[in-house]
Curated annotation (Swiss-Prot):
Gene: katG
Span list, region Disordered: 1-20
Molecular function (Gene Ontology), one example: heme binding
GO CC terms in record: cytoplasm; cytosol; extracellular region
Protein's recorded name: Catalase-peroxidase
Pfam families per record: peroxidase
Cofactor(s) demanded: heme b
C-alpha cells in the first residue's frame, strides 16, 4: 500500500451512517425500510402541494411546442442522430415505462424513477442520462407544473408526433418521487447483465420481466448472446407478456419503436467510464464518459450494436416490415463486436446520421428477426406488412398501454389529450350516474346489515377481503367495482370460503331491497354496501368492547361487470400468501413475514399501521379459514388490544408445533398448558425489535383507546385507497354515520 492510499473504504467512513450496519450483520433481517419510503421528509415540495391542480394550470400545448422544437435543436455536447432527437426520447420514454411488470405492479414510469439508481445506471439505459439533461431547460422553465415522470413520457409522445406518427393520446398526472424505490425486486444477480439467479430453476423468476439484470426486456443479441431469432422469440414472449403485452402488442411495439432512430456501437464498451451513480462528482450526475475518439455523434457507444432500421429514420413508415421480409439476412458483428444481422447482397442505401455522402446496408437485431421467424409473430408481422393502417393503430394503442399501464384508473388521467375510449386494461368501473345515499340512508342500511343474520366479524372480513386487493404500485384492485363477487376473485383460494359467499349474498339482498324501495333514482351500489358493512361491523366490535366510535364512510363507488373485468389480468392480484388473513405459508426463500411486509407495502402502510391492523384483524377473527391462529383473546369479535397484551405476556412460552416452523404453540410457562396458536405472521410482532416496540404501545395499560382509534383510522385508509375520484375532485367530505 502506497503512503497516499487510504486503508479504509467509504463504507467504513467514521461518520454518521458509516461502518457496518444492521443489514451487514443480519442480511436476512425484515425489510421494514420499504414501509417508510416516499414520505414528506424526502419531498422538497410544499406540504399539501397538489400536482393535479398544478398540471392543469400548465400551458400544455406550449410545453409540447417547446418539446417539438427541442427535437431538432442539436447540441454540440450530445449531437442528434440525423439532426433529430426523436429516437433518443422514444427510447427514454420506453425505458421509463417498460420496467413495469404485472405480477406485483411495481416498476414503470409512474414515479419518475429513471432519475435514480439503479435505473439511472442500468447498462440498458446508457446515454439516457443525456436525454434527461436535454430536457432540463424545459423542466426548469415549467417547474413543478410538470413532473419528471410525466415529462419523460410526454417527450416520447412528442417525439413520435414530430416524426409523423399519430399517437393514441396522453394522460398526465404522474407525481414524482424523490428517492429510489427500494421495494422493487430487480433480481438476485450481483453482476450487470447476469442472469444466473433468475433462471436458476430453468424459468424466468417471478415477478421479473427482464431476461438479464440491468436490461429492460431481453438481450437484443439473442439469449445469452446466442444470435438465434427463434430462441430469442421465446424470451420476448415471456418478458413482454409479463409486462402485460400480448403477441400483437409485442410485434407492434418492437416494429414501431424500431422504425425510428438507430443503435450505437461505434466501439467496445471498454471505452466507457463509470455509470452515473458511480461516476466522479465533477460529471454532475452524468456517466458513461467515453474515451473512444470524440465519444459522441458517430463515435457514440450505447448498446454496442450498430443498426439503422429504415431509410427514413425520422419519419413514420412501414419500412421495418418491408425490409424484414424483402431481404435475406446474414449474421455479422458490429464495430463493438456485438452480434447483429445485415441484408445479404444489398447495395448500401441507408443514410448515415451525420454524413450524407455515406450510405449503409440495412441491418437488423436478432430480436427483430424474431418477428419473421417465430411462426406466431410472423403471421402478425405479415398482416402489418400488408395493412399499414392496422400496424399504425396497433402501435398507437400498444404505446399508450406501455406508457400508461401503471398510471391507475381513468379518473387519474389529466390533460386535454386523454382519449375518450375506455380500455379493459384500465380496469374500468361504471360512472356514477345516480344520487348516492345520505346520512339517513346510511343509518337505515347499517341496521339492516347488522340484522342480516351474518355475524359482524364475517361482514367486516368481507369488507377487508374486498378493499385489501388494492396495490399502490399500479393502483389496481380495491373495493370500488365490487369485483370480489366476480371471476376471478370469487374463485381465489383465499376467497373460496362459505362465510364470504354468504355475506355477499346477504348484502346483495339488502341492496336489492333498498333500491327497489326508492321512488327516485337514488341507489346504493354493492361496492358501497360492502364498505359500509365494514364500517357498521367495526363500530359494533368497538361498542361491544366499550368504545364508542364513528367510522367514516363516503358513498360513490359503483359496481363493475364481468365484461369490464379482464380475468387473466386480475389473476395477477391473487395472493401467494397474505398475513393479514393468515393465508398461505412462506418458502425457504421468502418467509411468511416477508410476504406480509410485501403486502403491507402494496397497501401503502407504515409500520404502525401494519401493526395496529394485524392486532385488530386477529381479535376480529379475520383469518380466511376461521382458524384460531393469532386470535389471542377470550372475547373474539370485540375490538380490544388483547392481541398485543397476550403476545407480550412473559407468562407464555412459544415453541414450534412441528419442524416447518410455520405454526407455533404458546403455553403457560409454569403449567405447560397450551394457551394460543400462532403463525409467523403473528409472532413477528413480538420477535422483531421495531415491530415489538410498536406493539408495546398498543399492549400497555393505556394503549387500548389509542389502539381502537388507530385501527379505525387504518381501516378508513385501506377502504379508501382506490377512491381516486375523491382525491381528484376534492369531494372527500366523509359522511359521519349517526351513532
Amino acid at each position: 500500500m502506497g503512503s497516499n492510499e487510504c486503508p479504509y473504504s467509504r463504507q467504513n467512513a467514521n461518520i454518521g451512517g458509516g461502518g457496518q450496519n444492521n443489514r451487514d450483520w443480519w442480511p436476512d433481517d425484515l425489510k421494514l425500510n420499504i414501509l417508510r419510503q416516499h414520505n414528506s421528509v424526502s419531498n422538497p415540495l410544499d406540504k399539501g402541494f397538489d400536482y393535479t391542480a398544478a398540471f392543469n394550470s400548465l400551458d400544455y400545448f406550449g410545453l409540447k411546442r417547446d418539446l417539438e422544437a427541442l427535437m431538432t435543436d442539436s447540441q454540440d455536447w450530445w449531437p442528434a442522430d440525423f439532426g433529430h432527437y426523436g429516437g433518443l426520447f422514444i427510447r427514454m420514454a420506453w425505458h421509463s415505462a417498460g420496467t413495469y411488470r404485472v405480477f406485483d405492479g411495481r416498476g414503470g414510469g409512474g414515479q419518475g424513477q429513471q432519475r435514480f439508481a439503479p435505473l439511472n445506471s442500468w447498462p440498458d439505459n446508457v446515454s439516457l442520462d443525456k436525454a434527461r439533461r436535454l430536457l432540463w431547460p424545459i423542466k426548469q422553465k415549467y417547474g413543478s407544473k410538470i413532473s419528471w415522470a410525466d415529462l419523460l413520457i410526454l417527450a416520447g409522445n412528442v417525439a413520435l408526433e414530430s416524426m409523423g406518427f399519430k399517437t393514441f393520446g396522453f394522460a398526465g398526472g404522474r407525481s414524482d418521487t424523490w428517492e429510489a424505490d427500494q421495494s422493487v425486486f430487480w433480481g438476485g444477480e450481483k453482476e450487470w447483465l447476469g442472469n444466473d439467479v433468475r433462471y436458476l430453476n430453468g424459468e424466468l423468476d417471478n415477478p421479473l420481466a427482464a431476461s438479464h439484470m440491468g436490461l429492460i426486456y431481453v438481450n437484443p443479441e439473442g439469449p445469452n448472446k446466442n444470435p438465434d431469432p427463434v430462441l430469442a422469440a421465446k424470451d420476448i414472449r415471456i418478458t413482454f407478456g409479463r409486462m402485460a403485452m400480448n403477441d400483437e402488442e409485442t410485434v407492434a411495439l418492437i416494429a414501431g419503436g424500431h422504425t425510428f432512430g438507430k443503435t450505437h456501437g461505434a466501439g467496445p464498451a471498454t471505452h466507457l467510464g463509470k455509470e452515473p451513480h458511480g461516476a466522479g462528482i465533477e460529471l454532475q450526475g452524468l456517466g458513461w464518459e467515453s474515451g473512444f475518439e470524440s465519444g459522441t455523434g458517430r463515435h457514440a457507444i450505447t448498446s454496442g450494436l450498430e443498426v439503422i432500421w429504415t431509410k427514413t429514420p425520422t419519419k413514420w413508415s412501414n419500412q421495418f416490415f418491408e425490409y424484414l421480409f424483402k431481404y435475406d439476412w446474414e449474421l455479422t458483428k458490429s464495430p463493438a463486436g456485438a452480434h447483429q444481422y445485415v441484408a445479404k447482397g444489398v447495395e448500401p442505401f441507408i443514410p448515415d446520421p451525420f454524413d450524407p455522402s455515406i450510405k449503409h446496408p440495412p441491418r437488423m437485431l436478432t430480436t427483430d428477426l424474431s418477428l419473421r421467424y417465430d411462426p406466431e409473430y410472423e403471421k402478425i408481422s405479415r398482416r402489418f406488412l400488408e395493412n399499414p393502417d392496422q400496424f399504425a393503430d396497433a402501435f398507437a394503442r400498444a404505446w399508450f398501454k406501455l406508457t400508461h399501464r401503471d398510471v391507475g384508473p381513468r379518473v387519474l388521467y389529466q390533460g386535454p389529450e386523454v382519449p375518450s375510449e375506455v380500455l379493459i386494461w384500465q380496469d374500468p368501473v361504471p360512472p356514477l350516474d345516480h344520487p348516492v345515499i345520505d346520512n339517513d340512508d346510511i343509518a337505515t342500511l347499517k341496521k339492516a346489515i347488522l340484522n342480516s343474520g351474518i355475524s359482524h366479524t364475517d361482514l367486516f372480513s368481507t369488507a377487508w377481503a374486498s378493499a385489501s386487493t388494492f396495490r399502490g404500485s399500479d393502483k389496481r384492485g380495491g373495493a370500488n367495482g365490487a369485483r370480489i363477487r366476480l371471476s376471478p376473485q370469487k374463485n381465489w383460494k383465499v376467497n373460496s370460503q362459505p362465510w364470504l359467499s354468504e355475506s355477499l349474498a346477504a348484502l346483495e339482498k339488502i341492496q336489492k331491497q333498498f333500491n327497489d324501495a326508492q321512488s327516485t333514482d337514488k341507489r346504493v351500489s354493492l361496492a358501497d354496501l360492502i364498505v359500509l358493512a365494514g364500517a357498521a361491523s367495526l363500530e359494533k366490535a368497538a361498542r361491544d368492547a366499550g368504545h364508542n366510535v364513528s367510522v367514516s364512510f363516503t358513498p360513490g363507488r359503483t359496481d363493475a361487470t364481468q365484461e369490464q373485468t379482464d380475468v387473466d389480468s386480475f389473476n395477477n392480484l391473487e395472493p401467494i400468501a397474505d398475513g393479514f388473513r393468515n393465508y398461505g405459508r412462506g418458502t425457504p426463500r421468502v418467509l411468511t413475514e416477508d410476504f406480509l411486509i410485501d403486502k403491507a407495502q402494496l397497501l401503502n402502510l407504515s409500520p404502525p399501521e401494519l401493526t395496529v391492523l394485524i392486532g385488530g384483524l386477529r381479535v376480529l377473527n379475520n383469518n380466511y379459514d376461521r382458524s384460531n391462529l393469532g386470535v389471542f383473546t377470550k372475547r373474539p369479535g370485540q375490538l380490544t388490544n388483547d392481541f398485543f397484551v397476550n403476545l407480550l405476556d412473559m407468562g407464555v412460552q412459544w415453541k414450534p408445533a412441528d419442524d416447518t416452523n410455520e405454526i407455533f404453540i404458546g403455553s403457560d410457562r409454569k403449567t405447560g398448558q397450551a394457551r394460543w396458536k400462532a403463525s409467523r405472521a403473528d409472532l413477528v410482532f413480538g420477535s422483531h425489535a421495531e415491530l415489538r416496540a410498536i406493539s408495546e404501545v398498543y399492549g400497555s395499560s393505556d394503549g387500548e383507546a389509542k389502539f381502537v382509534k388507530d385501527f379505525v383510522a387504518a381501516w378508513e385508509k385501506v377502504s379508501n385507497l382506490d377512491r381516486f375520484d375523491l382525491k381528484q375532485t376534492g369531494l372527500a367530505q366523509r359522511i359521519k354515520p349517526q351513532l
